[in-house]
Amino acid sequence: MSRMVGTVSRGVRAPIIRSGDDLVEIVTKSVLEAAAQPEDGFAIRDRDVVAMTEAIVARAQGNYASVDDIAADVKEKLGGETVGVIFPILSRNRFAVCLRGIAKGAKKIILMLSYPSDEVGNHLIDPDVMDEKGVDPYRDVLTLEKYRELFGYTVHPFTGVDYVAYYMDLIRDCGAEAEVIFANDAKAILPYTKNVINCDIHTRKRTKRRLIAAGAEKVFSLDEILTAPVNGSGYNENYGLLGTNKATEDTVKLFPRDCQSMVEAIQKKLYDATGKHVEVMVYGDGAFKDPVGKIWELADPVVSPAYTAGLEGTPNELKLKYLADNDFAGLNGEELRQAIKGRIAAKDGSSLVGNMVSEGTTPRRLTDLIGSLCDLTSGSGDKGTPIVYIQGYFDNYTTE
């Protein structure tokens, strides 16, 4: 009988991870125990993928920082006076504790929020209402008074939070003066202060470049705050505060660091135990967008901070329905099946980009695709499966 199952993604349960735990041992043991289960076990094969969420990696590393640690670094880098904080995302989990730290490191915060939504799609206001009011988001800079006059007190549809009031109260509770404006041009902050933290994620380099070109004096992106330990805190030399999550009211879990040696150690340990060459990666947010809530999931700086060499690159695939409807339109049944399998088998290693037979396939990085699959598999709640085991991802229609 020919093979009938393609890609399979499994959530693998693991113990609750604490600081100092040996994650190489835990992940390897969890995968081997899952594979050996009598009812729903599986055979480990070459080119399977083991992935673990960044959260358990950072927890095992003890990569945490406090509000006071953030405040000390902000004060050291920006001077402790008036600081512009621009383009933050609207999130209690992702940004609120970071904002508390920033506020404790300054005397006054000028908060500049993008509108009608933040970078990842959390809406402050309804775009249709914005249009009705005649507001041009590309040019208009709104004060708080004008914003309230036009749009009133709006709350996030999922969380029920008025993020404007929430962020301003949070700043004041930390002892800093708070002022808020609404704009989408980074340069709009400069009449208020020349010292800026730009909090955008995927556009941060361009934003910083434009601010400096326009005369800003001190500009730091979030990935430049806590790039080294402060009073023994955690840190991330590459991403700073990007990718943080709330741990407690006063601490954040930072994005994990030094992950490459860990994924390679897990790969070796699994090979020693099974004789199979398995790929390994760490994943964070998936790179997908909710079509209803309009939220782009990717609030981390990257989908995968570390992965083994076999996960480098992009897919190189043929579009089966194109072949069936065009090249082999006159064939049916087994003859069609064999013709398509022959075309797939004839692929060489050269790129198919620009070739009609690949039109409609997915020219995205493997780690972004697989990381998104992992994020959807593990979820973000109480499934208890921070490890994902994927089989058949690199197979195709010819694989038996």
Name each model feature, range by range.
Residues 2-46, 55-400:
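Conserved mixed alpha/beta catalytic, RNA-binding, or beta-rich assembly cores of soluble enzyme
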